[in-house]
């Protein structure tokens, strides 16, 4: 872990920073006034967070001008009507506010309002001009279709 830098938002739990053994870098987030003020005072960029870790990481990757972004495990839907993997403490089924979207195979799949908002945020973000030269691959096995991504098997991405 000492060789892996940690990018964090100003809203991070403070003990994580105290206990992390490697380098840490603050990401100033859009829409959080104190963070925007801090960034302005130090002439630092602000990043779109989109409400999730994935959307924040995507904005960072785009700003870093990464050649390729590969999404893995990004279902953005309820596979078997679960919101977390089997065996975790947070597995639960929800019905209120759910909606149906198309999955990567063109079939209907259930998702939640927040997951669909993340999906739409990602779709809009990868269509912006600063992401035009990048490749976005969805290597998740299933899940909601993210327009603008190419569907590929993870082993193909790794070994090609």
Regions found by a protein language model. Name each.
Residues 1-160:
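Metal-ion/cofactor- or nucleotide/acyl-coenzyme-handling active-site neighborhoods
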């Amino acid at each position: 872990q000492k060789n892996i830098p940690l990018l964090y938002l100003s809203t991070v739990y403070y003990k994580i920073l105290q206990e992390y053994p490697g380098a840490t870098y603050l990401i100033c987030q859009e829409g959080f006034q104190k963070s925007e003020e801090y960034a302005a005072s130090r002439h630092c960029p602000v990043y779109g967070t989109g409400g999730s870790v994935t959307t924040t990481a995507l904005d960072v990757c785009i700003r870093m001008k990464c050649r390729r972004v590969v999404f893995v495990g990004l279902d953005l839907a309820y596979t078997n009507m679960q919101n977390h993997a089997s065996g975790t403490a947070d597995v639960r089924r929800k019905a209120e506010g759910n909606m149906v979207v198309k999955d990567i195979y063109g079939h209907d799949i259930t998702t939640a309002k927040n997951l669909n908002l993340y999906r739409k945020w990602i779709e809009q973000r990868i269509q912006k001009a600063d992401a035009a030269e990048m490749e976005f691959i969805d290597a998740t096995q299933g899940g909601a279709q993210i327009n603008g991504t190419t569907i590929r098997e993870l082993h193909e991405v790794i070994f090609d």
